[in-house]
Each structure stands twice: as C-alpha cells, then as structure tokens.
Design a protein with these regions (language model features):
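Surface-exposed loop and turn segments in beta-propeller and other repeat-based domains
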Residues: 114-126, 170-184, 228-252, 297-327
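Beta-propeller blade signature
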Residues: 155-163, 215-228, 286-288
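Short acidic/glycine-rich loop or secondary-structure boundary segments that cap or lie
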Residues: 272, 280-285, 293-298, 306-311, ...
C-alpha cells in the first residue's frame, strides 16, 4: 500500500511500511490457457444496466466543471470495524466490507456485521500485506478476493455466493510471488466484458530495484487481465502481449509502481487507476478498456509527469492528474461519484491522500483538470466504496467506515 519518510514512525506501527534492499530475482509467470476475446455485454455509456446512465450520457464528456458550486459536506460514522479496506455491493443491495486482517462482513443488509468469509488464518498483515480487495462477479454468484497468502504472495480466488453467504470451496484464480512485503497493489475490478483486472505493484523497494515496471516478462508493476467466466481461468485472446515471446501473456498494461486503488465507472466506460509515487509525484490515470490494452503508465522511467530513471517510454500514457508532495505523500484512489444525495459531485472522481486525509474531487477547468478540496478530512484513509444507493463510503485504517453527506 504505502511508503513515505514523513510518516515512517506512524505507519511502521501500523505495519504499513517495509523497506528492504533487493537481492532477489523475479520468477517467470506460470503459462495460462488462452480463451477467445470476450464480447462487451453492451453495458457502457447510456446502458440500461445503470439507472443513472441516461443522465450521464446526456452530459458533455468529461468531468464536472470546476466552477460548479459545491455544498457544505461532512462525514458521518456508519460503523467501526478492524482496518476496513474495500467494499462491494451484491445484487440485492447488501454491502460487504473487507477487513485487512482477512474477514469479510455484511456492512448493511438483513444481518449487519455478520462475518460471511474469514481467511484470517491464511494471510498476514506484515508490511502491506493482508486481504486487499473484494469484488462480486457480474454474474452475481461468486465473490472474488485478492489477498496475500501466509507466505506473502499474491492470491486471487473466487468464493461461491449463496445470497449474502459463502457456500462451498473457492476456486483458485491467480497467484504470483511477491519478493517483499510492500508494493503489493492488489485491487481487483471487473470490466463490462466480464474480464477481471488485477493491479500489482512493482514488487517493493525504493526506485524499482527489480526493474519490474518496464519488464513485460513479469506481472509485477502491471495490470493483469483474465477471463474468469463460466468457471474458466484463461488469458483473453486480445491481450496485447499474447504473441510476444518474452512477455507474460496475462499482462494488459505496464508501468505502475503501486496501484492503490482502481475503479471502473460503468456509465462512462472508464477505468481509473491511482498510482502511489516515489518521493515527488502522486498520479491518477484514466483509460477506456480499449486504451488499457498495451498502455505503459511510465514507472520507473517516469514518476507522474516528471522523469525518474530515464526517457519517456514508447506508448507512454501520461496521468490525467498528478500532484506533488507537501501535506500529501501517498495517494488513496477513490471512485467516480454516482449517488443522488450530492448531485453537484456527480461525475467527479473523489480521492484523498493517506497523509493529509483531505477529500478532493477532480473537475474540469477549461482544458485542464483540477482537484478541488471538499472541505472534509478523514484520518489515514486506505479505501473508498459505496453503499447500495451509490453514496460514498470512506474507509480509515483505524477502523471507521464513514459516509459522505450534505450538511
């Protein structure tokens, strides 16, 4: 998840930083079968699959205007848990929340606070490890979980869902070795075509000592794209590096340091990726699924919009927005707000920073993108989510789940 000199003492106490010299080599990935490229299900801008899509599609493309008046906002506490880190919403509106230690609970619904999954005996919270992300499959009967196992390696598996409960044995989706206990990444999201995306950090250590960010032979520092429909685990045949002998076929995009977090905005058909920087810049990337394939987000040749280890790589996709260090130090990516309670925010990407906790929204200022402060601050935010109504949830490592509301 994190790193920063200015918060070393605090974050070490939370198990969120591990710095180590790198003396290891990357393992080659295990080959996966290839499946025909999945067809888009038609859910995108203007799709009937989102009850707000008609509204959104009628707006001009892009973010809301920066001169829009914003209301006074505040954060109300929903519940206190143990290091909540991610959420997902089931078909019936039940909200599940993942705790970093390995439990998935019902946040609200018929039986609030009920534990539906407990993998705490199979993971560890050393360094930046733990249960990192959850996502319900588009077909509704599987809960996908991204975590590090007891050895610290990345593990993605799918648990069969029966209503809001877990029934049966999980199926293994993907594993890869993690050389160190930081820069694990771990966010998972589904695209409209049913493919699963997994964001992975560069393997750890300052300055990308493994060279993973620009090394297509490893899934580290990359976004993995898999076809996991109908019980299969395969590489889609349109993955960009499938025919490249020295590349991992599952890699869809490269050049990431530590993606924290990813979100797919279904009405606009856009993937948002927040990538934690080294010591100068924090960045936010926005691409369509088509633009994702073969994208190079720059690390470690670039850090945000500035050079780091070399020249700008071929095919570089620069960030939509980046910012320097000051009050902030380590971005916590959010999502595009699609709720009804705060229409002034609708269509804006809300995010924060682990160090200063100020919630911000990306908005359009002419040809430029700017971040406006929302006037509300949380403490050490490590994730965002939504409730069943699409209202924004803020997750603090200290345990609080907060909802963004109008004053």
């Amino acid at each position: 998840m994190r790193r920063r000199t200015s918060m070393v003492v605090t974050l070490l106490a939370s198990g969120l930083i591990l710095a180590a010299a790198c003396t290891t080599e990357l393992d080659p990935p295990t080959p996966l079968p290839v499946a025909p490229a999945p067809a888009d299900d038609g859910a995108g801008p203007g799709s009937e699959d989102d009850d707000r899509a008609d509204d959104v599609a009628s707006e001009a493309p892009g973010l809301p205007p920066a001169d829009r008046d914003l209301p006074r906002l505040s954060l109300e506490e929903v519940v206190t848990l143990e290091a909540p880190i991610d959420t997902t919403v089931l078909e019936d509106g039940t909200v599940l929340v993942a705790e970093r230690a390995g439990r998935v609970r019902v946040l609200d619904g018929p039986t609030p606070d009920r534990i539906v999954l407990d993998v705490s005996g199979r993971t560890t919270t050393d360094g930046e490890r733990g249960l990192l992300s959850i996502a319900v499959a588009p077909w509704g009967d599987e809960l996908f979980v991204s975590m590090t196992d007891a050895d610290g390696d990345t593990l993605v598996e799918a648990h069969p869902l029966d209503g809001a409960g877990i029934e049966g044995t999980p199926r293994s989706i993907y594993t890869t070795r993690q050389p160190f206990a930081n820069h694990n990444g771990g966010p998972i999201v589904f695209l409209p075509d049913g493919t699963l995306l997994l964001g992975l950090g560069d393997g750890g250590g300052a300055g990308d000592p493994l060279g993973a960010g620009q090394d297509l032979s490893t899934p580290l520092g990359a976004i993995v794209r898999l076809d996991v429909r109908d019980g299969r685990v395969a590489v889609p045949s349109d993955n960009p590096f499938l025919e490249q002998a020295d590349a991992a076929a599952e890699v869809a995009a490269s050049g990431l340091r530590n993606p924290w977090r990813m979100a797919f905005d279904r009405p606009r058909g856009e993937l948002w990726i927040a990538d934690v920087g080294q010591s100068e810049r924090e960045e936010i990337n926005r691409v369509t699924p088509a633009q994702l394939l073969g994208a190079n987000f720059g690390w470690a040749l670039r850090e945000g919009t500035v050079p780091f280890l070399g020249e700008e790589p071929d095919g570089h996709v620069p960030p939509l927005h980046d910012y320097g260090h000051g009050p902030g130090c380590s971005i916590t990516g959010g999502l595009v707000y699609r709720g009804d309670a705060i229409p002034e925010l609708r269509g804006g990407y809300v995010f924060t920073d682990l160090c200063d906790g100020e919630l911000r929204v990306l908005m359009q200022d002419g040809a430029d993108v700017t971040a406006r402060e929302l006037g509300v601050t949380a403490t050490r935010v490590i994730g965002f989510g939504t409730d069943a109504d699409g209202e924004l949830l803020v997750l603090e490592i200290g345990g609080r789940v907060l909802r963004l509301v109008r004053d």
